Regions:
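Amphipathic alpha-helical segments used for helix-helix packing
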Residues: 37-60, 112-120
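Short, flexible helix-adjacent loops and helix caps
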Residues: 11, 15-18, 50, 54-57, ...
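Amphipathic alpha-helical packing segments from all-alpha helical-bundle domains
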Residues: 4, 22, 55-85, 96, ...
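Active-site micro-motifs of SAM-dependent methyltransferase domains
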Residues: 5, 51, 103, 107
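Hydrophobic alpha-helical connector segments
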Residues: 8-43, 64, 95-101, 147
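A short, mixed-charge helix-start or loop-turn motif at secondary-structure junctions
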Residues: 9-14, 56-62, 119-127
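C-terminal peripheral helix-coil segments that are non-catalytic and often amphipathic
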Residues: 30-33, 70, 74-86, 90, ...
């Protein structure tokens, strides 16, 4: 259920008034925001996947089998397919794009520099680091799918 909630949050940044690449940027910003709320969340997620490897398979399978897909993921999948058909982005599976975004985002918090924890680092340094990483990930993902 917890992993399902994470993907249901996908619906929030999919603003219909924005172009597709801006929506991707919103998704990255949104997931960063969730992980910034509690510095224990990223290690918890990674630990859950390591300690319970079957959960990763269940998570991925949930979005590959049509009968059990979430409505948020269906919407995202439709947007990706539409952009591929229009030639705006390179061919990519929606699940792979989403997992790339999620793994790049979470890795920012897992491989952060020593002394990065909120109580070990001044807030400006922390904000600068997170902003730089968010921009780098946004550029990497968008440049990787843009045609």
């Amino acid at each position: 259920p917890k992993m399902e909630q994470v993907v249901e949050y996908l619906d929030a940044p999919l603003d219909e008034s924005l172009n597709f690449l801006d929506r991707i940027s919103n998704i990255i910003d949104f997931y960063f925001g969730i992980l910034e709320l509690d510095e224990r969340l990223a290690p918890f997620i990674v630990n859950e996947l390591i300690m319970h490897p079957g959960r990763w398979d269940m998570f991925r399978d949930r979005f590959l089998r049509n009968e059990s897909r979430s409505s948020a993921f269906d919407r995202f999948d439709g947007m990706v397919k539409e952009e591929v058909a229009k030639g705006t982005i390179v061919p990519v599976e929606a699940i792979d794009l989403l997992l790339n975004i999620m793994s790049l985002t979470i890795s920012t918090f897992i491989v952060a520099p020593k002394g990065f924890a909120k109580d070990e680092c001044d807030s400006n340094s922390r904000k600068e680091y997170l902003l730089r990483r968010k921009e780098n990930i946004r550029d990497l993902v968008i440049n990787g799918i843009r045609k």
